[in-house]
Amino acid sequence: MALIRVLASLLILQLSYAVTPFDRIIGGFECNEYEHRSLVHLYNSSGFFCSGTLLNHEWVLTAAHCNRDDIQIKLGVHNVSVNYEDEQIRVPKEKLCCHSTNNCTQLGQDIMLIRLNSSVNYSEHIAPLSLPSNRPSMGSVCRVMGWGLLTSPEVTFPKVPHCVDINILHIQVCQAAYPSMSENYLLCAGVLEGGKDSCKGDSGGPLICNREIQGIVSWGGFPCAQLLEPGVYTKVFDYIDWIEGIIAGNTSVTCPSDNF
């Protein structure tokens, strides 16, 4: 079912501290300590629940369904049980979603910008990721990363983020797996044979192609990494005008039409 990952994530969130909307990366490997400098750790009093991507000194990009009332953003994290000298913590100064009501709980356009309460200092473990300059090419090998589950449906969470390389697939592959989904503003990515995927806990994190963020982990099938059930990602390129407008201070900028 198209929304089953999100629903399962919400259920797990009630049961476990590290439970976020998606499991950990399936079929991947430990990320190098210095290759995820833009990856941020979103948590609250209940624990870790999502990831996000640092775009510049004061803006983070994540999924709208990662919205919470008491978000804290930790930057410069690798091993969650270790405190790093350059680790920094921020809270939202402002949260912006595509919906005219700023209702970040809708799943229609799963994208959210967080303006941080103070500027972030770049460091050995902290650096921004570039927005896409072009649309991703079909078949491109891209990397998704996060602290989500390593196994599914069994619950095994990592202390360090994991990475996995997957392919950009034709949107019809995901539409065949999830008949109710729209093709608007979404990317389909994974491997057709299964075994590699993002999952609960990876929500909001980046799908990186050629050192640019092309996707935001959104939803997919559950259990994760099944045959012919790729992941679904928010297509960042379709929101470039909105993202750049908001960051530039243009409060009148609008998202692509949400008429699906």
Curated annotation (Swiss-Prot):
Keyword Metal-binding assigned: no
Active site feature: H65 (charge relay system), D110 (charge relay system), S203 (charge relay system)
Domain Peptidase S1: 25-248
Intracellular or extracellular location(s): Secreted
Documented activity regulation: Completely inhibited by NPGB, PMSF, diisopropylfluorophosphate (DFP), benzamidine and soybean trypsin inhibitor. Not inhibited by EDTA.
GO biological process: proteolysis
GO molecular function: serine-type endopeptidase activity; toxin activity
Entry-linked Pfam families: Trypsin
Bridged cysteine pairs (disulfide): C31-C163, C50-C66, C98-C255, C142-C209, C174-C188, C199-C224
Signal sequence coordinates: 1-18
Residues with attached carbohydrate: N44, N79, N117, N121, N250
PROSITE patterns registered for this protein in UniProt: TRYPSIN_DOM (PS50240), TRYPSIN_HIS (PS00134), TRYPSIN_SER (PS00135)
Propeptide: 19-24
GO CC term, one of those recorded: extracellular region
Protein keywords: Disulfide bond, Fibrinogenolytic toxin, Glycoprotein, Hemostasis impairing toxin, Hydrolase, Protease, Secreted, Serine protease, Signal, Toxin
Domain of life, per lineage: Eukaryota
Tissues in which the protein is found: Expressed by the venom gland.
Annotated InterPro entries: Peptidase_S1_PA, Peptidase_S1_PA_chymotrypsin, Peptidase_S1A, Trypsin_dom, TRYPSIN_HIS, TRYPSIN_SER
UniProt EC number: 3.4.21.-
CDD domains listed in its UniProt record: Tryp_SPc
Keyword presence, Disulfide bond: yes
More about this protein: Negative results: does not hydrolyze casein. Does not clot fibrinogen or act on factor X, prothrombin and plasminogen. Does not have hemorrhagic activity.
The protein's role, per its UniProt record: Snake venom serine protease that possesses potent fibrinogenolytic (on both alpha- (FGA) and beta-chains (FGB)) and amidolytic activities. Selectively cleaves Arg-|-Xaa or Lys-|-Xaa bonds.
Family membership noted in the UniProt record: Belongs to the peptidase S1 family. Snake venom subfamily.
Subunit: Monomer.
Name of protein: Alpha- and beta-fibrinogenase OhS1
Record organism: Ophiophagus hannah
